[in-house]
Amino acid sequence: MTNRARRLSGNARRYWLALLACAAVALPTAALAQQVLIKFPHDLAPNTPKGLGADYFKKLVAERLPGRAAVEVYPSASLMDDQTSLEALAFGEIQMIAISVSKLESLTKRFQVFDLPFLFADMAQVEAFQNSAVGTRLLGELEGRGILGLAYWHNGMKHLTARKPLHVPADAKGLKFRIQDSDVLLEQIRAVGGNPQKMPFGEVYQALQTGAIDAQENTWSNIYASAFYEVQPYVTETDHGYIGYLVAVNPRFWRGLTADVRGVLEQALEETTAHVNSIARSVNDDARGRVLASGRTTLITLTPAEREQWRAAMRPVWDRFAGGIGPELLKAAGAAP
């Protein structure tokens, strides 16, 4: 190579290095930083309140933190089931969950308050408790276990579906009921003479279809989205309990975010929570209408006297679990002394 060629080669190299340096300076800091990835698995269909909430949160994050943060939603237990997600969150394998409050009793008995039958008369009472000082403090009680609660999302009030009509507690005697992994729900079904079976949500349809179980409890949105009405000819509208979710993150992940990114995520979650909880009733009402319009199940509406029989049969369950829940929570939830 001639001296002139060497000079040209050196000049070209310096030119490109200078150009790259200028480009790097021109890039915003966020573009050079690694994108924050939030893996968010859940166990329900996308058209349920939880599923709609996860997708709404994903949308807000994509709009407000493009290139800086992204949410990957895995519905219908496509990545893992609820119980597995608790451990995965604590170990930092995933970053966010919206888990049924019924499934937290292995970590603390305090969340059992949400499962007490006939404790909450309606969703307004649920919201009043969750928004109280006591309910807000409950969100943070699992941080030491790797689960930092940020919000409560509603599904709705529960009803009973079965292969036979259920008018009074005696009708439930001997029936195999699927329940969530909750000792409160176990005793609730035993209180009416049923045979409770703890089972993951994803296995329920087939178990109902094959007759492995005879009945289950759920909200209208879950009954519709999972097509339980196709294999359960009767729905008894009881409003006997609540299904809702703790939206939680891994605390180490959350505290490790930059303040500006965490602030945007907090605002997005606050707006998502308001959205989910405002649409939960309409989603359940719509699901109820679709189930009844299908003509595949019969609705049983309890008389006041029949409903009182269910309440009286299940009420003793409160006494069994009151000690673990604590008087402060029971009082805030509106439980009678």
Give short role names for the model-derived ranges.
Residues 2-19:
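Bacterial N-terminal signal peptides that target proteins for export
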Residues 27-33:
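Sec/Tat signal peptide C-region and signal peptidase I cleavage site
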Residues 18, 22, 34-125, 133-337:
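N-terminal secretory/targeting leader peptides
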